[in-house]
């Protein structure tokens, strides 16, 4: 048992609490491993005269209790909701994000892949047309913390998700369409951690397993978005401007315990600008155009930095193949590469797009 000194805040547990309260809560801490950072620093607080008289089980219980007090699964839910927002785009894409991290925190990486299929009902583009979009998405978040010589914790989150959304493509003019959309989705979230070093293996692993690390759950998401699609020809370029404001709610449905149960909300604004310049060339017998890509995403809400960043830009280039003469349902296919950059993140991605 923890003695009276600890209860008064002068023993090991008091040292833990003091250090927990002094950790800077900046956006540059990766939110998904921040609790591990806190727990690791908390153990440093245990290196006090009270350590000699404390039992290992008591230390594990103390770390677990304080991690439970500071662990906020809402951040995990908010991070998942933010990743769901990435799937709003109709493009097949693979992106790699590398958020910045603080000293001692290994720079995390977020890998996102999505495969959407969109079905538009009706051929009259001058009239409102309903559409359905199904998306299969996969994400991994890898991170870690090197908090002492010979000590390391590596964490990996893996999520699989499926969403189905429906909406209307409502023409407002020759160039502008309005896109209201509602959606629902299901996802699985799984975490696995690797511990290296005696402190990590003997104290932090039993203290944090099933709470901060090494647990899985499922979640349902509900979302709505209002978007626009503006297209016209300017100075020999076909210009497309797509924008949307979206809001997603995510809720765990079979959390292993009450401490990792979450309900989170996330809002985002996405802007995507594409310029298409026809060329005299052909690829595989299809007219070829050069495409310029520019985009911006901003995440809003109290947990907007759950992924370690709340905004980023995209810039890239690609090619567009006009396949309309083949009689397919598709009008064009697009392939490109993009750079991702922002105040707290950088990365890159690949795009395979299509236009119906």
Predicted segment positions?
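N-terminal signal peptide c-region/cleavage motif recognized by signal peptidases
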Residues: 47-49
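Short glycine/proline- and aromatic-enriched beta-strand/turn motifs that initiate or cap beta-hairpins
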Residues: 53-150
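Outer-membrane pore/translocation modules
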Residues: 60-68, 122-268, 298-300, 304-310
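Residue-level detector of the transmembrane beta-barrel scaffold of outer-membrane proteins
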Residues: 83, 87-89, 127-135, 177-181, ...
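Transmembrane beta-barrel architecture of outer-membrane proteins
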Residues: 108-116, 159-163, 219-225, 268-272, ...
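Outer-membrane beta-barrel architecture
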Residues: 114-121, 165-167, 225-229, 270-276, ...
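Outer-membrane beta-barrel strand-turn architecture
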Residues: 121-126, 170-178, 232-236, 279-284, ...
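Outer membrane beta-barrel transmembrane domains
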Residues: 253-356
């Amino acid at each position: 048992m923890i003695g009276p000194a600890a209860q008064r805040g002068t023993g090991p547990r008091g040292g833990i609490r003091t250090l927990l309260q002094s950790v800077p809560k900046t956006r540059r801490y990766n939110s998904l491993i921040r609790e591990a950072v806190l727990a690791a620093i908390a153990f440093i607080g245990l290196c006090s005269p009270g350590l000699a008289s404390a039992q290992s089980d008591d230390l594990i219980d103390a770390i677990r209790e304080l991690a439970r007090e500071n662990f906020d699964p809402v951040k995990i839910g908010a991070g998942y909701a933010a990743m769901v927002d990435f799937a709003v785009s109709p493009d097949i894409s693979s992106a790699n994000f590398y958020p910045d991290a603080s000293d001692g925190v290994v720079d995390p990486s977020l890998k996102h892949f999505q495969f959407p299929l969109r079905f538009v009902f009706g051929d009259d583009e001058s009239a409102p047309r309903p559409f359905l979009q199904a998306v299969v998405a996969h994400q991994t978040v890898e991170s870690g913390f090197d908090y002492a010589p010979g000590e390391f914790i590596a964490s990996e989150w893996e999520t699989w998700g499926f969403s189905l959304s429906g909406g209307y493509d409502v023409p407002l003019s020759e160039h502008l369409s309005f896109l209201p959309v509602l959606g629902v989705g299901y996802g699985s979230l799984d975490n696995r951690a690797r511990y290296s070093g005696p402190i990590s293996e003997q104290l932090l692993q039993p203290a944090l397993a099933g709470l901060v690390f090494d647990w899985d759950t499922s979640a349902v998401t509900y979302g709505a978005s209002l978007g626009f699609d503006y297209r016209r020809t300017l100075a020999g370029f076909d210009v497309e401007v797509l924008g949307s404001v979206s809001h997603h709610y995510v809720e765990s449905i079979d959390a292993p315990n009450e401490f990792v149960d979450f309900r989170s909300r996330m809002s985002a604004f996405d802007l995507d600008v594409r310029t298409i310049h026809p060329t005299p060339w052909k690829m595989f017998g299809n007219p070829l155009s050069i495409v310029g890509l520019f985009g911006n995403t901003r995440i809003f809400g109290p947990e907007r930095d759950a992924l370690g960043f709340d905004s980023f830009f995209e810039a890239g280039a690609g090619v567009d193949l006009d396949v309309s003469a083949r009689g397919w349902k598709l009008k064009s296919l697009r392939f490109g590469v993009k750079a991702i950059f922002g105040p707290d993140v950088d990365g890159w991605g690949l795009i395979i797009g299509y236009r119906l």
